[in-house]
């Protein structure tokens, strides 16, 4: 009795102690609690010698089932509920019994239950991926529909079993397959499953966004709007769903949203329509291409304007404060209207580069005359050139993004599924790839990064296997530049500003400095700020690399895990810590006069344990 969902069927048939999955459409929290209570109430079978074959199948009593079949029981014979033994074995994930029944002549696609479902349908409803794989290997047809008109992939979508969705599509089932009503899996997901998944997951397989169903002629976006599924609407708009297609009633998605009076969806659709309309203008397209450059120019001008206001020849700090507030208000309008949301993450990067630009200009115009003959001159020039070089290398170098073709993704999914490894530890549901050791999916870059350290706020790029060593030098030379500017600022202030610190104290001294050169004090504050965070990050990175052999992500993850463990977890005792010299040699890939040799590991394609010849250690993922 499948009823409206598998939960009622499970209760009515009392099919033994298997954990129930989601109810129909994945919205069944209350029913799951009832099933859990019912399962706890099931009596344990102490004497299996007298139980019938249905109950023996439900409980996975292989010897009793084998005894009854060899005694003449027909494995094709359904019970009084029109459910076959293969159905009961499939829903309870009894792999050995399924193999046995098929070897004895069971029909792998036998229909049964109130909804005329196959054993494959039952296994999918409960999310039993190993059972799905086994049935498909024995010839189960995933294109068959049940009594509700759903095929295998539709059921997997409705019950939100992403590994099964990935496996079915990788085995060749079309992501655009329609049910009896002409609805694709994407339509069902957008309409029936409230939330970002599995809509976002399906979109990674490039489904048709603008196909319409048979009855209502709705697109997936129509269905998402009809259900008020804000997350699905957002995903579909991001993927490029059409806003102009009309359904059988002549309604666009916006018309439906206006009828439903869903203000958030109305705002989303109108905003998207406005953005797409702007794409038709050549000037708008040019502005989009130049967003990063314009953001950098805005930052440079804003920082100059702040310094100019502070250095303005006026004793009224109230006037200067009002001018600063006005400046911040005006500059905040530019990113809001002309810079896309994705490029706003580069605002700290623009701030850093603008700071360095005005630091250099201040040194060249104000500090150079006093320090031209000192070693400071060459050191500063070298430091700022090196900083710009390593910033560029950190920004431009591939940090270790893992890439795979469509065919490689499908082969990986099938391989992982059939080896029992298709889970979140080894498979990235965003990139649809097998995750290398020490990798992590960056949600800003939307890609898995090999030997992931962090997504750097100041460079706007991920730090990983490919650019981590450049990042270290970037921090080092930024600290050098700021350190020299701090030194130069004090030299300039001491030689150009008359102060009476010994006579009048600190407060008077500060007032004299502010009155003497607000611009230099402003640059000094910027340099001190950048020196503080860059030096802290540099020391932290060197400690992690040399003494722990860990990345920032690994260190934070281990510290979080340690809080939930009874015994304190030592960060030094990890498989990656090979000692001070070996850690540095491996990280920078350089030896030390033959005393230490680096171990070359390509972390973009390292999926298994690594044997390290230097220390005879086995490296594992943390």
From Swiss-Prot:
Residues 426-476 form the DHHC domain. One of its GO terms (cellular component) is membrane. InterPro entries: Ankyrin_rpt, Ankyrin_rpt-contain_sf, Palmitoyltrfase_DHHC. GO terms for molecular function: magnesium ion transmembrane transporter activity; palmitoyltransferase activity; protein-cysteine S-palmitoyltransferase activity. ANK repeats lie at residues 43-78, 81-110, 115-144, 148-177, 181-211, 216-245, 249-277. The active site is at 456 (s-palmitoyl cysteine intermediate). The modification N-acetylmethionine is found at residue 1. It holds the Pfam family DHHC. It is found in: Golgi apparatus membrane; Cytoplasmic vesicle membrane. The keyword Transmembrane helix applies. It catalyses: L-cysteinyl-[protein] + hexadecanoyl-CoA = S-hexadecanoyl-L-cysteinyl-[protein] + CoA. Keywords: Acetylation, Acyltransferase, ANK repeat, Cytoplasmic vesicle, Golgi apparatus, Lipoprotein, Membrane, Palmitate, Repeat, Transferase, Transmembrane, Transmembrane helix. Its EC number is 2.3.1.225. The chain crosses the membrane at residues 292-312, 321-341, 348-368, 371-391, 471-491, 519-539. Its main location: Golgi. GO terms for biological process: positive regulation of canonical NF-kappaB signal transduction. Residues 1-291, 342-347, 392-470, 540-622 are cytoplasmic. It is a multi-pass membrane protein. The keyword Transferase applies. Residues 313-320, 369-370, 492-518 are lumenal. It comes from the Eukaryota. The DHHC domain is required for palmitoyltransferase activity. Belongs to the DHHC palmitoyltransferase family. AKR/ZDHHC17 subfamily. Palmitoyltransferase that could catalyze the addition of palmitate onto various protein substrates. Palmitoyltransferase for HTT and GAD2. May play a role in Mg(2+) transport. Interacts (via ANK repeats) with CLIP3. Interacts (via ANK repeats) with DNAJC5 (via C-terminus). Interacts (via ANK repeats) with HTT. Interacts (via ANK repeats) with MAP6. Interacts (via ANK repeats) with SNAP23. Interacts (via ANK repeats) with SNAP25. May interact (via ANK repeats) with SPRED2. This is Palmitoyltransferase ZDHHC13. It comes from Homo sapiens (Human).
């Amino acid at each position: 009795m499948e009823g409206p969902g598998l939960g009622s069927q499970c209760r009515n048939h009392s099919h033994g102690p298997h954990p129930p999955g989601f109810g129909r459409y994945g919205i069944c929290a209350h029913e799951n609690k009832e099933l859990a209570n019912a399962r706890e109430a099931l009596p344990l079978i102490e004497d299996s010698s007298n139980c019938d074959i249905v109950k023996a199948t439900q409980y996975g009593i292989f010897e009793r089932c084998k005894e009854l079949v060899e005694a003449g029981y027909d494995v094709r014979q359904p019970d009084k509920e029109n459910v076959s033994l293969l159905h009961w074995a499939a829903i309870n994930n009894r792999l050995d019994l399924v193999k046995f029944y098929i070897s004895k002549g069971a029909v792998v696609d036998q229909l049964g239950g109130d909804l005329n479902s196959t054993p494959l349908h039952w296994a999918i409803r409960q999310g039993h991926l190993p059972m799905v794989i086994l049935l498909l290997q024995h010839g189960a047809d995933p294109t068959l529909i049940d009594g509700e008109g759903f095929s295998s992939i539709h059921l997997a979508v409705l019950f939100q079993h992403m590994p099964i969705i990935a496996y079915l599509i990788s085995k060749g089932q079309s992501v655009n397959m329609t049910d009896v009503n002409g609805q694709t899996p994407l339509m069902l997901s957008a309409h029936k499953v409230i939330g970002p998944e599995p809509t976002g997951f399906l979109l990674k397989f490039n489904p048709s966004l603008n196909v319409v169903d048979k009855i209502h002629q709705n697109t997936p976006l129509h269905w998402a709007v009809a259900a008020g599924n804000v997350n699905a609407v957002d995903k579909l708009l991001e993927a490029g769903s059409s806003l102009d297609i009309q359904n059988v009633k002549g309604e666009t998605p916006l018309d439906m949203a206006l009828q439903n009076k869903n203000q958030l969806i109305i705002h989303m659709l109108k905003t998207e329509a406005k953005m797409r309309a702007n794409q038709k203008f050549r000037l708008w397209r040019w502005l989009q291409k130049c967003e990063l450059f314009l953001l950098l120019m805005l930052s440079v001008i804003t920082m100059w304007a702040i310094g100019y206001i502070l250095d303005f020849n006026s004793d009224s700090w109230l006037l200067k404060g009002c001018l600063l507030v006005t400046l911040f208000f005006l500059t905040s309008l530019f990113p809001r209207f002309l810079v896309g949301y994705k490029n706003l993450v580069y605002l700290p990067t623009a701030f850093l580069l603008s700071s360095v630009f005005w630091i250099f200009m201040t040194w060249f115009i104000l500090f150079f005359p006093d320090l031209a003959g000192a070693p400071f001159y060459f050191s500063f020039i070298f430091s700022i050139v090196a900083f710009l070089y390593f910033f560029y290398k950190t920004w431009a170098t591939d940090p270790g993004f893992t890439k795979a073709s469509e065919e490689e993704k499908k082969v990986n999914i099938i391989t992982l599924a059939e080896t029992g490894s298709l889970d979140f530890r080894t498979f990235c549901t965003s990139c649809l790839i097998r995750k290398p050791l020490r990798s992590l999916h960056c949600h800003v870059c939307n890609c898995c990064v090999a030997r992931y350290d962090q997504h750097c706020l100041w460079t706007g790029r991920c730090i990983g296997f490919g650019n981590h060593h450049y990042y270290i030098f970037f921090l080092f030379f930024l600290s050098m530049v700021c350190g020299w500017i701090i030194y130069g600022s004090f030299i300039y202030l001491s030689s150009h500003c008359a102060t009476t610190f010994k006579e009048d104290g600190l407060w008077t001294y500060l007032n004299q400095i502010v009155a003497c050169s607000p611009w230099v004090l402003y640059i000094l504050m910027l340099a001190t700020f950048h020196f503080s965070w860059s030096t802290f990050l540099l020391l932290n990175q060197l400690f992690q690399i040399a003494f722990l052999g860990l990345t920032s992500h690994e260190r934070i993850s281990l510290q979080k895990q340690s809080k939930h463990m009874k015994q304190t977890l030592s960060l030094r005792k990890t498989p990656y810590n090979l000692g001070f010299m070996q850690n540095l040699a491996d990280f920078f890939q350089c030896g030390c006069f033959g005393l230490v040799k680096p171990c070359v590991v390509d972390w973009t394609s390292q999926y298994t344990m690594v044997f390290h010849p230097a220390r005879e250690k086995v490296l594992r993922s943390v």
